Structures are given as C-alpha cells and as structure tokens.
C-alpha cells in the first residue's frame, strides 16, 4: 500500500468534519471512523455518514460500543441531565476515557490499513475542558501508540494529528469554509433530536453558535 492514508475520527460535528476536509486537502486518502457508543445524541451518526459521503472518503466505519453500560456521563446516562448553563470544572458531559477508547480503535484500523496518520478534532481553546482534548493527552497517546504496536516497534511510527488543537472556534469555521465544508450536514448538539435539530442551550451549541458569529459566517444550525 503506497498511497498516503489516514484514519480520521468523525463524530459528525463541526470540528471533525473540518478535520476530514483538511486531511483531504493535504492529499490523504481518508478513512473515517464513528462510534455508536450509547450516546443520547445519536443524530450525530447520521451526520457523520452525510459528511463522509459529501467529502468523498474512501471508507466510513461505524463501530458499536456500549459505553452507556459504564455510564458516568450525561451523554451516556439518561438519569444525568445535560447542563444548560456554564459551570466550573470538568462538566458532566465528559465521557470517561472516551478519546482514549476511540483513538485506540482508530490505531488498530490504521495498523491494518498501513496508515501512519490518525487525525482527531480535539481543541484546547474554545472547548469544554475535557482532559482528553489537551495537547498533553495527544502527545502521550502518540508515544503509547508507537510502543504498543507492531508497526511502531518496527520503526513505522504513527502520528496523532490534531490540527485544530490551538484554533479558536471561529478559526475552525473559517478553515472549514475555505475547504468547502457544508456545515448544514453536521450535528454538534448534545441533545439533538432524531432529525438533528439542536437545543441551542448546551455547551456544545453555545460554542458552535459563538464560533459562527465570531467568524462572520451564517450559522446553518436547525433548532427545535
């Protein structure tokens, strides 16, 4: 396999759609991976499929996980309400170890594909404070990936790429628009209904709306 391949985590939201477009612009053959992990906002899976089709990825996988069997998050446990006001500390929408689990499965697929690059749309500027979105986490996972895999041990190192890490939400929107991302296809809301309409109140909705406003770009989000 000689082409330039990348595995990209695609949630169906604004950030991950932007990352797919950026990777494609860099000449990568894009293989996207989404997760049906018991999240309450399952409309994002439909959004991920739409984005994958629109951006012409080579293959799109949806992996089933039962993270709601663990619970501990407002996104996987319906007995915990999604907060609709900003709070302090790490919010209850944090899903324990989610990005570690997702990246581990992406790493496995990348090794099978002989891809050396894995992209993730984490951000540490306009974000909710999740610990697994920080640069330190990304760097640590890359070190682990190259210790834990046959490819890494044999010197065919993996790179975990987080191109949005230091961008504001407005800069992310502008980058996506420059690459032709159709943000009307995406779903960011933690409480999106089955049609992908947003609540307009959760932290993810606030960050998204503020990003479009600051970027001077019309927000295509539909609300219920």
From Swiss-Prot:
Look at the named UniProt entry and state the broad enzyme category this protein falls under: ligase
Keywords (A to Z) from UniProt: ATP-binding, Ligase, Metal-binding, Nucleotide-binding, Queuosine biosynthesis, Zinc
Kindly tell me the pathway this chain contributes to. Purine metabolism; 7-cyano-7-deazaguanine biosynthesis
InterPro entries to which the protein is assigned, alphabetical: QueC (IPR018317), Rossmann-like_a/b/a_fold (IPR014729)
Can you tell me which residues bind ATP? 10-20
| Protein residues bound to Zn(2+) | 189, 199, 202, 205
This one is known as 7-cyano-7-deazaguanine synthase
> Native species of this protein?
Pseudomonas entomophila (strain L48)
């Amino acid at each position: 396999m000689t082409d330039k391949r990348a595995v990209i985590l695609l949630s169906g939201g604004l950030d991950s759609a932007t990352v797919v477009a950026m990777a494609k612009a860099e000449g990568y053959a894009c293989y996207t991976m989404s997760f049906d992990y018991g999240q309450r906002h399952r409309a994002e899976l439909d959004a991920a499929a739409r984005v994958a089709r629109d951006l012409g990825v080579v293959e799109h996988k949806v992996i089933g996980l039962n993270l709601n069997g663990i619970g501990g998050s407002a996104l996987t446990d319906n007995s915990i309400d999604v907060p609709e006001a900003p709070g302090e500390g790490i919010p209850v929408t944090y899903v324990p170890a989610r990005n570690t689990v997702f990246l581990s499965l992406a790493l496995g697929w990348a090794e099978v594909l002989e891809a050396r690059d894995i992209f993730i749309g984490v951000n540490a500027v306009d974000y909710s404070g999740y610990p697994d979105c920080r640069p330190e986490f990304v760097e640590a996972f890359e070190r682990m990936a190259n210790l834990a895999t046959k490819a890494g041990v044999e010197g065919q190192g993996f790179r975990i790429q987080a191109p949005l890490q230091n961008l504001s939400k407005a800069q992310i929107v502008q980058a996506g628009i420059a690459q032709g991302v159709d943000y009307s296809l995406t779903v960011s809301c933690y409480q999106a209904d089955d049609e992908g309409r947003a609540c307009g109140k959760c932290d993810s909705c606030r960050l998204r709306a503020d990003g479009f406003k600051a970027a001077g770009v019309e927000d295509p989000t539909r609300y219920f």
